C-alpha cells in the first residue's frame, strides 16, 4: 500500500506525520510513503535527511495578509492543487493523511476530487484553518486533545493523541537502568564543576531556545531563598544566540547551572527533571505527558491564534500542569511559582500523575489502524 503524508511547515505538524509513516511502513515491507510539503517548510530540510521521498508543491497562507498577498496566496493554492493532482496520478496512493500546514490543503482537496481516502490529524487544542476546512471532506479527523473536538464533525472525529516517533518513544519510556543518566556534573555559570543538588529544574524553549525564558530564568532563580538555591540543579537549553548571555547571568548571581545551546539527549534531561519549564507546543506536550512530568508552561504568545496557550489550558484544567503567560514571568511571578513547587513535592507528583493519565502512547498505531480499516467520508456541510 501507498500513503501520502501532506503538510508541515513546522515541526509540530511534521513530526506526528513522520511517526505515522514509521508505523505504516512497519506493517508491511512493501508499503511506501511519500511526503508532500512546501519549499519554505521544515519538511524541505528534514524529510530528505530522514531518507523519505519528498515532493514540494506551491502553498501559502492568506490569513492576516493584505489584498495583494491574499491574491498571491490564493493563486499559489490553485497551482498547488494542480501539482497535487499530478502527484496523485503519478504516485497512486491508497491513503492521504493531512497533518496541518498550508501544503496539506491542496493535497487533501485533490485527494477528495479523485475519491482517494483522506484523513487529517490535528495536534493543537485550537485547530488551524487548513484542518477546519479539510474536516468537511475527510474520512476521519484524528485529534490530540479533546478540546479540539468541538471544531470538527462529531460523527467522524476520534481522539488518538499526538503520535511520537518510535525512537523518541523508546528513549522516553526507557528506565534509568536501561539508559543511565548521561548529563555531566553541573557547571557553575557554564565553567566550574560542582556537586549534585536535590531539585532538578530543566528549562528549554525548543531547539532555538526562547529569549524571554532565557532572560527570566536566571533572574527568577536569583530571587529564591539561599536554601532553595543550594538545593536546585539547573539544566538550561538556551539556543545558540543567548548562550553566553545566560551563562553570564547565572555567573553574575553566583548560581550553579548547566547551560547548553542544544541538548541531544532530551529523554535523559526529561527523566531527571523534577520540574520542567518550557513552551506549550503540541509535540512537547506529547513528550512530557508520555513521561508523566510536572511542567510549568509559558506559552509562546505569538503562536497562531494563541494556540499554545489553549494547549496549556487544556492540561491546566485537568491539573496536569502549571502555567504562566509570558507577561507574568518577570518580577517575582516565576520565582514564586518555582519556590512554591519546590516546597511541595506532593503537588509536583500529582501534576505528573495527572499528566501521565493524558498520555496516549499508541497514537500512531491507532491512526494507522483506522486508515487501514477505511471509513466513509464525513458529511459535507
Swiss-Prot record:
- Gene Ontology biological process: carbohydrate metabolic process; cell division; cell wall organization; lipid glycosylation; peptidoglycan biosynthetic process; regulation of cell shape
- Which organism is this entry from? Trichlorobacter lovleyi (strain ATCC BAA-1151 / DSM 17278 / SZ)
EC id: 2.4.1.227
**Catalytic activity reported:** di-trans,octa-cis-undecaprenyl diphospho-N-acetyl-alpha-D-muramoyl-L-alanyl-D-glutamyl-meso-2,6-diaminopimeloyl-D-alanyl-D-alanine + UDP-N-acetyl-alpha-D-glucosamine = di-trans,octa-cis-undecaprenyl diphospho-[N-acetyl-alpha-D-glucosaminyl-(1->4)]-N-acetyl-alpha-D-muramoyl-L-alanyl-D-glutamyl-meso-2,6-diaminopimeloyl-D-alanyl-D-alanine + UDP + H(+)
Q: Which family does it belong to?
A: Belongs to the glycosyltransferase 28 family. MurG subfamily.
- Keywords in alphabetical order: Cell cycle, Cell division, Cell inner membrane, Cell membrane, Cell shape, Cell wall biogenesis/degradation, Glycosyltransferase, Membrane, Peptidoglycan synthesis, Transferase
Please spell out the taxonomic lineage of the organism that makes this protein.
Bacteria, Pseudomonadati, Thermodesulfobacteriota, Desulfuromonadia, Geobacterales
The record's listing under SUPFAM superfamilies reads:
UDP-Glycosyltransferase/glycogen phosphorylase
Q: Specify one Pfam family.
A: Glyco_transf_28
Q: What is this protein called?
A: UDP-N-acetylglucosamine--N-acetylmuramyl-(pentapeptide) pyrophosphoryl-undecaprenol N-acetylglucosamine transferase
What GO cellular-component annotations does this UniProt entry give?
A: plasma membrane
Task: Report which superkingdom the organism of origin falls in.
Answer: Bacteria
Q: What function does the entry list?
A: Cell wall formation. Catalyzes the transfer of a GlcNAc subunit on undecaprenyl-pyrophosphoryl-MurNAc-pentapeptide (lipid intermediate I) to form undecaprenyl-pyrophosphoryl-MurNAc-(pentapeptide)GlcNAc (lipid intermediate II).
In terms of Gene3D superfamilies, this protein maps to:
Glycogen Phosphorylase B
State where UDP-N-acetyl-alpha-D-glucosamine binds: 10-12, 124, 165, 207, 263, 308
This protein's pathway reads: Cell wall biogenesis; peptidoglycan biosynthesis
Membrane topology label: Peripheral membrane protein
The encoding gene: murG
